[in-house]
Amino acid sequence: MSVASPIQCIRILNPSSSSSSSTASSSFRFSTTTKPCVFIIRCSQTEGPLRRPSAPPTLREPQKPVPPSQPSSSPPPSPPPQKAVAVDGKSVTTVEFQRQKAKELQEYFKQKKLEAAGQGPFFGFQPKNEISNGRWAMFGFAVGMLTEYATGSDLVDQVKILLSNFGILDLE
């Protein structure tokens, strides 16, 4: 059971008093505590469906294309990746260090996946195979039940009809 507190104050401002603006503003105050909570509801005078407000267009000047420089005979040597740099007593990780660690982690998990695939029985009761087999069995059972309902012949008769129709057995 919930106890609802009475609304002590609702204040609605008359939108016709401010004719200079195109939007109406209403203020509701539900003060049940010492600290009042004020809600302001604004509505526009436009009609039609609700629309998401659009962002103002950004003004960018088009950049002039930079002519490509002449390629040198040898590419500049890449700097060795830095592990961590201490700046004002704080440890800063570089992008190259993160990239190198990400590649190492990818290789580690690839290797671990290959090792896990190599272990275990090739044939036998594996959970993934058992789930798949169970789903196929339930699907076949559901199809058999629907066929029995539609044709009136039971599951054993359906198997006999299938075997005779495919020419595997002559049961008639």
UniProtKB/Swiss-Prot annotation:
Keyword Lyase among UniProt keywords: no
Compositionally biased intervals (Pro residues): 64-82
Subcellular localization: Plastid, Chloroplast thylakoid membrane
Membrane topology term: Single-pass membrane protein
Recorded consequence of changing residue 135 to A: Abolishes chlorophyll binding of OHP1 and OHP2 heterodimer
Transit peptide feature range: 1-43
Disruption phenotype: High light sensitivity leading to stunted growth with pale-green leaves on agar plates, but unable to grow on soil.
Broad class of where this protein is predominantly found: plastid
Gene3D superfamilies: Chlorophyll a/b binding protein domain
Positions of transmembrane segments: 136-156
Location of region: Disordered: 45-90
Task performed by this protein: May play a photoprotective role within PSI in response to light stress. Forms a trimeric complex with OHP1 and HCF244 that is required to promote PSII core subunit assembly. The trimeric complex forms a transient PSII reaction center-like complex with PsbA, PsbD, PsbE, PsbF and PsbI subunits in thylakoids for early assembly of PSII as well as PSII repair. The trimeric complex is required for the recruitment of ribosomes to the psbA mRNA during PSII biogenesis and repair.
Protein family according to the UniProt entry: Belongs to the ELIP/psbS family.
PANTHER family on file: OS02G0610700 PROTEIN
Protein name: Light-harvesting complex-like protein OHP2, chloroplastic
Annotated source species: Arabidopsis thaliana (Mouse-ear cress)
